[in-house]
Amino acid sequence: MRSLLVGALMAPTLALSQVVGLGTTPVGATFQLATGVAKVVSDKGGVQMRTQPMAGAAQYAPLVNKGDIDFGISNVPELHYLVKGEVIVDNRPHPDLRMVARLVPWYNGLVVKKDSPLRTLKDLKGQPVPAGFTGNPLGRVLITGYLANAGMTFDDTRQVPVPSFPRMFDAFKQQQTATSIATIGMAQLKEWESALGGVRFLQFDPSPAAAAAVTRHVPHSRVVEVKPGPGKTGVDTPTHILVYDYALWVNARVPEEVVAKVAQALHDHPAELKATSPLWAEFDTAQLGRDVGIPYHPGAVKVYQSKGLWKR
């Protein structure tokens, strides 16, 4: 975070020292991605990027919007809500957020113990499900969408209040809940494999009506079939789950040359990114400038144009 004296005189980012902050969650899959971005940008991009963990994007997006933190990371559905000031941050738009890069597809859903009798989202009726998420509203939004796929709401479950994703992870590990939000490739899946004897993703309903019910709550998402394979803990048979994109974003006033260095580092070092976490398995440099419905920062646009990746 830049000093108050510098902040009073210049645009966001410590332009002289090239030190920038990256807002992220404290644990979980988002933090895994953020640490990978920060490592590659710091090692290869000529910009020192330091992660600044907070409870969730609802906490760090206002700071990025003001320029107190330079960069942020989140999924694209959440970013849309943040920019518009809807659902996650009611009536608090964040108009100064700009895209830097589309990072990876994010395969997510709800997991249960491998030996659980629950097989589909519909089986969660009457089961203990994490709820509340006062510290990170994204959890409430996602589970609302998941349950909608099964024609249910939180009222159809036994709600177990959790304030945050870390508390949700712990509640599931302690079997205070029957399920937890999870993402293919996240570190917690391996932890649960050991502690719980295995985990398994619950099946989504892929029918058009059921898939549309999810996207009403989780925009820019889709239901897809994922087949078993290396790094896909929790997917033992072909399983329908949710997917959306993850994004790196920035304050609109961060200098173009700084954003360009970040975008260039991501483009030029895919192997280094993939080495940081299984979450990067499907990272594709050709998709860095993908249109996700949010304007891109001109510093990133220039890089993608120079690489022939900007198609609009």
Task: Place the predicted regions along the sequence by residue.
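N-terminal (or domain-start) structured segment
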Residues: Q18-L82, V87-D90
